[in-house]
Regions:
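Active-site-adjacent loops and short helices of periplasmic peptidoglycan-processing enzymes
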Residues: 24-27, 31-189
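Penicillin-recognizing serine hydrolase domain
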Residues: 35-43, 51, 139-304
Length: 304
């Protein structure tokens, strides 16, 4: 998707679906563990979620564009709205579809007039990276008399939430990652803080760990969405979280994996090989070696 010279990419390549294969997990030597992971990402961060302990980082506080990983905050603002009703129905407007078409954006392909619940739209937001779903949620949870006012209000809520969470080097100018002026940025450390917060919400966790979902609108239309995060179903214990790709941001990934009672969350920003980077970081955190065959997506599925 492109706007104001900053793009968040929508891929159209058709891929054949397959089942991911796991290799035997082997322990890592103490010497290898001491060196830390070697990753190609320009920025990265790794934390142990429960004790909130930093495990490793690279350029942790350097500000970078975040593309569609922005949508993690979109979801958090919705889910942490006081008295939020996840079953509330939202009617899809033509303006949501027009926005996607105008920006060449990733989409949940929402149809005008369909009514879906807030919970369903969270799946449409986080799995296919639907900018139309993001628009619908921002339009609903913002305040004001016009769409422009409501979405602006929602973005203000995103920035207030970032401030509340101590994300001092993060700014949002977008509800979905399409930045008009390049003022939509974060740092690996800030993004990891947000990931940890988000994973504390059970609804968020259920959404982002799903590799696919079928959701039925009130008129009976069935939406099938596939998760753009290929780490799911490919890396043992992976439980999320969100992809993002942009012309300035590059490929980004906010990710997490759980083994036993331990949850590790990580971030890579502007990575030439985000899944390999994530695998290396998680292997290092869990002190294991794995090989990984990436889950592929069906023909026509959104890729971000």
């Amino acid at each position: 998707m492109r706007s104001g010279g900053i793009s968040v990419r929508r891929w159209g390549t058709a891929l054949v679906a397959s089942t991911a294969a796991f290799a035997v997990i082997t322990p890592m030597s103490s010497a290898q563990a001491a060196t830390g992971p070697s990753v190609g990402a320009k920025g990265a961060f790794l934390l142990d979620s429960k004790p909130n302990k930093t495990l490793w980082s690279k350029a942790a506080d350097t500000k970078r564009q975040m593309a569609s990983t922005t949508k993690v905050m979109t979801a958090v603002v919705v889910l942490e709205t006081r008295g939020v009703d996840l079953n509330k129905k939202i009617t899809v407007k033509q303006s949501y579809r027009d926005y996607v078409a105008r920006n060449g954006a990733s989409t949940a392909d929402l149809k005008k007039g369909d009514k879906l619940s807030v919970r369903q739209l969270l799946y449409g937001l986080m799995l296919p990276s639907g900018c139309d779903a993001a628009f619908a949620l921002a339009d609903t949870f913002g305040t004001g008399t016009t769409e422009a006012a409501r979405t602006k209000s929602f973005i203000s809520k995103m920035n207030r939430k970032a401030s509340d969470l101590g994300m001092a080097n993060t700014k949002y100018d977008s509800f979905d990652g399409i930045s008009q002026a390049g003022n939509n940025y974060t740092t690996p450390r800030d993004s990891a803080k947000l990931a940890r917060r988000a994973l504390g919400n059970s609804t968020f966790g259920s959404v982002v760990k799903a590799t696919s979902t079928k959701q039925t609108a009130t008129n009976g239309r069935v939406y099938t969405w596939y998760n753009t995060n290929k780490l799911l179903g490919s890396y043992s214990g992976a439980i999320g979280i969100k992809t993002g790709t942009g012309s300035v941001a590059g490929p980004c990934l906010v990710f997490a994996a759980k083994r036993g009672d331990r949850t590790v969350a990580g971030v890579v920003l502007n990575s030439p090989d985000r899944y390999t980077d994530a695998k290396k970081m998680l292997d290092w955190a869990f002190r294991t070696h794995t090989t990984m065959k990436l889950r592929t997506l069906p023909a026509g599925a959104e890729q971000d």
